[in-house]
């Protein structure tokens, strides 16, 4: 049964005739089909701008007369204090709730507004939304009631979303007598105008205030019809009436529980599926039961402010909300006041001045960023990629049985009692356990994992790691030599490249001489390095012969030094500037001493993303061609991905699959190296056009899902301690990672983007990281051979097999 073309009469006969159990079953099925296991909430602060109101609703304790208030309105300082308190503990939303048009009823309100230079309450609300957005960065949600089209338009540039409860379309309710703003047509006009203005809108119904079942259906049908016209209703709240002391309805019975469940289920079945369905968790004692009625959102939950509309009913603590949600087989995720469907289409749904604020607080799915603090204390310093802070605990030590059974790994000790991973994520993991390679949609599903689902993905990845490469953790002693930071390309993410017209983010442009490069190679050898990594900008004066000269000077300085250098961009440009085929050029580079290419310059192998990040750089096919050609001439390379800037999980999935396909063709990739975007000094972030890097949940998933997708293709997964810190890497070693990369003497590309971690790690640092986990640290060569105690590379046939190279390539190496 669908509701797209159902009339009110047919809805009444079809749905109201069903028993409650059947309604609940159908509603939950709709929710599961559309939203899976995910249930969202909005971390918010509640800002009661004014508690004066011209209406006299019989159930309301929010509205107060002037005599009971210290002042008619909160001052700007009070508004900022509330907003800052919320921002300090990770809130994303500033919910402005206020009485409707109090200046029309109370002279004191009109006088206060006039004294402060405002013509109306809405005008003052606009100013306070702008103040909070600009000074604190929270995203305003304006819940100002029945507004005119012009008033809604005034608020659109300073709010991420707006809202108004429709409540009921019954014009004869006693509770609304003396309340001019509750006239049904007035509220319908506001709902319609919000759609015309393309405002992400929240509305809802109030159950138990004297309305009939048919009244509820009529209101839900009206909301559904408005949404079908404009697509603007992002959520509908179904709220139950509870009597409150001091109100005209204090002796009225509360909304019967079964009536409330029925109303929620009806809403899910009547409304279009793309409208989210919300209930307030603080108004029902056993709120977990409401999940059975098809809801997918708990609404705003504040860690610092009361529910001023229902002050006698405090919000549940986040820990309890999480536990209740997970015990019911769902996972909890923070969101913004604007839902992902709207946040990911900012040109349509957001005024220009609101777009960066939403982007800055978004994760890759358009949901709210996790509060990434190490201790769980929401006021602690937040982790970002590159920041010198501990990440949150996402992957805890699994409850491993004596046999290491995956079934035990899938039930981590951190999960709430009685909870289990189910739904789409579990289905994909089941397929992986049966040997299937996940496809694009399935990989996107895994990247959407939350809570216990993340731990299940990590557990499976780590089991695969153990099967494929065992418990050794490898590292290579190497030195980075970045020979120039002058670059003709305009990659918008890069804080390393310099040019005469570019923003100078990290010192003056430089260009090392060949003699200086040779000296650094000799120094690296003296420090025990077995590899040098050569990378730099694309200098306008360099041609292909320059890269050949660098390779030769390095090889001559230390003949047994492994030369790992020159990205796909550098070799492509070198060949192009020399006007010779890439294969011929790479053969000459190999003859000069080059052994392997880094996978950098890949960024995201999705040309739609590359057009924004690096429009003048090589495209996806050119990157693949460079590495395919390198493999064909006997050079090896690795796969990197830079994630967390502007792209979304589908681009990640495409990147993984397209590189897996090339590996199946050539066998030339030795490892997968995820590189989290470091935002602090990146031009695109400073231009207010990117996110602030991945969340740590996304970091864990990238490494774990990489391990899963590349099973049987690329055996080694490396974590970048430079971008993540050793504390971040520690958790990744329980999520499929088996390699720490290099000691990276003189690593300065990440630092140019704002990373705070040091430029060198030591073997002792790595050992302190690995051994407490019961793993064994082993020094390797670039190609995953082993290094003996004297620092000499030795052939390790098992390690050679683990590189994933095909036999023909090994023979031609």
Where do the protein language model's features map onto the residues?
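Short, small-residue-rich loop/turn micro-motifs
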Residues: 53, 61, 98-100, 166-168, ...
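N-terminal [4Fe-4S]-dependent radical SAM core
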Residues: 11-58, 62-73, 77-78, 82, ...
């Amino acid at each position: 049964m669908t509701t797209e073309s159902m009339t009110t009469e047919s809805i009444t006969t079809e749905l109201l005739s069903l028993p409650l159990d059947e309604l609940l079953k159908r509603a939950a099925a709709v929710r599961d089909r559309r939203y899976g296991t995910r249930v969202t909430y909005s971390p918010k602060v509640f800002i009661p701008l004014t508690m004066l109101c011209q209406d006299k609703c019989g159930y309301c304790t929010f509205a107060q007369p002037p005599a009971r208030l210290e002042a008619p309105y909160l001052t700007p300082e009070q508004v900022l204090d509330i907003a800052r308190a919320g921002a300090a503990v990770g809130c994303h939303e500033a919910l402005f709730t206020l009485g409707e048009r109090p200046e029309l009823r109370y002279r004191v309100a009109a006088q206060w507004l006039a004294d402060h230079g405002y013509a109306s309450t809405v005008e003052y609300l606009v100013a306070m939304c702008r103040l909070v957005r600009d000074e604190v960065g929270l995203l305003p949600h304006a819940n100002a009631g029945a507004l005119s089209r012009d008033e809604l338009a005034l608020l659109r540039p300073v709010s991420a979303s707006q809202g108004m409860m429709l409540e009921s379309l019954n014009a004869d309710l006693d509770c609304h007598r003396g309340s001019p703003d509750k006239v049904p047509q007035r509220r319908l006009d506001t709902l319609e105008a919000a759609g015309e203005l393309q405002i992400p809108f929240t509305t809802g119904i109030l159950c138990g205030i004297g309305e009939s079942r048919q009244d509820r259906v009529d209101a839900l049908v009206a909301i559904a019809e408005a949404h079908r016209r404009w697509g603007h209703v992002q959520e509908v709240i179904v709220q139950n009436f509870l009597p409150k002391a001091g109100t005209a309805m204090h002796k009225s019975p509360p909304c019967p529980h079964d009536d409330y469940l029925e109303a929620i289920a009806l809403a899910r079945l009547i409304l279009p599926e793309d409208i989210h369905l919300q209930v307030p968790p603080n108004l029902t004692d056993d709120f977990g039961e409401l999940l059975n009625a098809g809801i997918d959102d708990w609404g705003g939950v504040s860690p610092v402010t009361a529910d001023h509309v229902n002050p006698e009913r405090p919000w549940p603590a986040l820990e309890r909300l999480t536990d209740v949600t997970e015990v019911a087989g769902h996972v909890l995720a923070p969101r913004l006041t604007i839902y992902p469907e709207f946040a990911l289409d900012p040109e349509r749904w957001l005024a220009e001045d609101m777009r960066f604020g939403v982007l800055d607080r978004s994760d890759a799915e358009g949901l709210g960023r996790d509060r990434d603090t190490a201790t769980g204390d929401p006021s602690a310093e937040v982790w970002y990629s590159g920041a010198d802070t501990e990440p949150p605990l996402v992957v805890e030590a699994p409850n491993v049985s004596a046999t290491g059974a995956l079934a035990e790994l899938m039930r981590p000790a951190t999960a709430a009692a009685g909870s289990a991973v189910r739904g789409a994520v579990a289905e994909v993991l089941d397929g992986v356990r049966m040997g299937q390679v996940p496809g694009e949609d399935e990989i996107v599903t895994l990247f959407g994992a939350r809570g216990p689902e993340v731990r299940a993905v990590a557990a499976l990845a780590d089991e695969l790691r153990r099967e494929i490469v065992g418990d050794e953790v490898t590292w290579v002693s190497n030195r980075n030599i970045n020979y120039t930071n002058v670059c003709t390309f305009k990659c918008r993410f890069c804080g390393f490249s310099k040019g005469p017209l570019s923003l100078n983010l990290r010192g003056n442009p430089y260009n090392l001489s060949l003699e200086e490069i040779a000296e650094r190679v000799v120094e690296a050898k003296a420090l025990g390095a077995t590899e040098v990594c050569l990378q730099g900008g694309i200098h306008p004066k360099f041609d292909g012969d320059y890269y050949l000269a660098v390779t030769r000077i390095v090889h001559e300085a230390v003949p047994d030094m492994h030369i790992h250098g020159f990205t796909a961009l550098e070799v492509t440009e070198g060949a192009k500037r020399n006007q010779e085929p890439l294969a011929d050029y790479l053969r000459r580079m190999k003859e000069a001493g080059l052994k392997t290419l880094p996978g950098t310059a890949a960024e995201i192998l999705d040309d739609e993303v590359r057009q924004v990040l690096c429009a003048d750089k090589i495209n996806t096919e050119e990157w693949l061609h460079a590495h395919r050609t390198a493999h064909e001439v006997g050079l090896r390379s690795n796969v990197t991905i830079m994630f967390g800037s502007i792209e979304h999980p589908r681009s990640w999935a495409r990147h993984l699959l397209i590189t897996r396909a090339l590996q199946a063709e050539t066998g030339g990739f030795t490892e997968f190296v995820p590189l989290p975007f470091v935002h602090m000094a990146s031009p695109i972030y400073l231009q207010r056009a990117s996110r602030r890097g991945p969340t740590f949940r996304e970091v864990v998933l990238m490494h774990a899902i990489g391990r899963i997708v590349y099973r049987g293709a690329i055996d080694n997964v490396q974590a970048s301690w430079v971008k993540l810190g050793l504390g971040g890497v520690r958790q990744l070693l329980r999520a499929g990672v088996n390699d720490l990369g290099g000691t990276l003497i003189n690593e300065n590309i990440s630092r140019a983007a704002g990373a705070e971690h040091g430029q060198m790690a030591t073997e002792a640092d790595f050992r302190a990281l690995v051994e407490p986990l019961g793993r064994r640290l082993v020094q390797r060569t670039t190609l995953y051979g082993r290094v003996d105690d004297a620092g000499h590379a030795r052939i390790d046939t098992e390690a050679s097999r683990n590189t994933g190279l095909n036999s023909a390539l090994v023979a031609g190496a």
